[in-house]
Design a protein with these regions (language model features):
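Catalytic core of membrane glycerolipid acyltransferases/transacylases, capturing the structured
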Residues: 44-102
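Charged, low-complexity C-terminal accessory regions
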Residues: 203-205, 213-252
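Helix-to-loop junction immediately C-terminal to a conserved catalytic motif
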Residues: 17, 22-54
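A conditional alpha-helix N-cap/helix-loop micro-motif detector
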Residues: 32, 53, 78, 101-105, ...
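A cross-family acyltransferase "interaction/gating" segment
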Residues: 135-224
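Alpha-helical membrane-targeting segments
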Residues: 4-31, 82-92, 174-203
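Generic beta-sheet signal
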Residues: 46-52, 119-125, 159
Length: 252
């Protein structure tokens, strides 16, 4: 398959505040060089859940640019609490997770409604750990299973889970804020109780590898019905993690 390169164009004079336009502008401002492989694998006409490894604030804009559509990404609870960052979260259409003590019922309700409206949802299954700890481009944390539950419960006949590997070839790593300062906005987050600074990975050259989608439909659910919901969710989670791990190795 030929590797396709997608130039990042300057902000047009007719620039709108759509999440896709904001993403393109942010990538232009950052001067990132990116390429995409496997874009033709993204299904058309059905809701999608985009999942990916996650090390940088640039990941969501990159995924929107690669898929050429707005994607409503789940994000950490604290991001909806910080002045300035909160406004960016709203402009990008992100959906902050609920406060830990409240569970995630309200978040799942919003996400399921978005899928019912055929919107694209983005989930970073590794959680926040690779964002606050310094990692290597090919490192991968164990996936949480929330995205699989979301896909299984979506009130639609058919939905695709699309795994994407973000493979950084060249980057800068800066320190932006003391981790403990963030505990002011989310005291229950254990990652914010540690010493050190929140890193900020800025990609300079990156490839997005779009993997094989997993289509969840009536046939899929019926095939695994005897295994039970928990076993099916585990299998879907492991399948997507293995796909992204394989793509990251290919991109090294």
């Amino acid at each position: 398959m030929v590797l396709a390169s997608y130039p990042i164009y300057p902000m047009p004079r007719s620039f709108s505040t759509s999440p896709l336009d904001i993403s393109n502008w942010l990538l232009t401002w950052a001067g990132v060089r990116m390429s995409v492989q496997g874009q033709e694998r993204i299904p058309e006409g059905i809701p999608v859940v985009i999942i990916s490894n996650h090390r940088s604030f640039m990941d969501a804009p990159l995924l929107m640019h690669a898929t050429q559509r707005p994607v409503r990404f789940a994000c950490h609870h604290y991001m909806g609490q910080v002045p300035g960052l909160r406004e960016m979260v709203n402009a990008m259409g992100f959906m902050p997770l609920d406060a830990p003590e409240n569970g995630q019922t309200a978040f799942f309700r919003r996400a399921l409604q978005a899928l019912a409206n055929h919107e694209a949802i983005g989930i970073f299954p590794e959680g926040a750990a690779p964002m606050v700890n310094k990692t290597k481009p090919w490192d991968l944390e164990r996936f949480h299973r929330g995205f699989a539950y979301l896909a299984m419960r979506a009130p639609v006949e058919k939905i695709a889970v699309v795994p994407v590997a973000i493979a950084s070839h060249r980057e800068m790593n800066n320190s932006v804020v003391p981790l403990r300062l963030l505990s002011l906005f989310d005291p229950a987050e254990p990652l914010f109780q540690q010493s050190g600074w929140h890193p900020a990975v800025v990609y300079q050259d990156v490839t997005l590898w779009i993997g094989h989608p997993v289509v969840v439909d009536a046939r899929f659910r019926a095939h695994y019905q005897t295994k039970g919901a928990s076993a099916l969710v585990t299998e879907l989670t492991n399948c997507c993690q293995d796909e992204i791990a394989t793509l990251l190795k290919r991109g090294r």
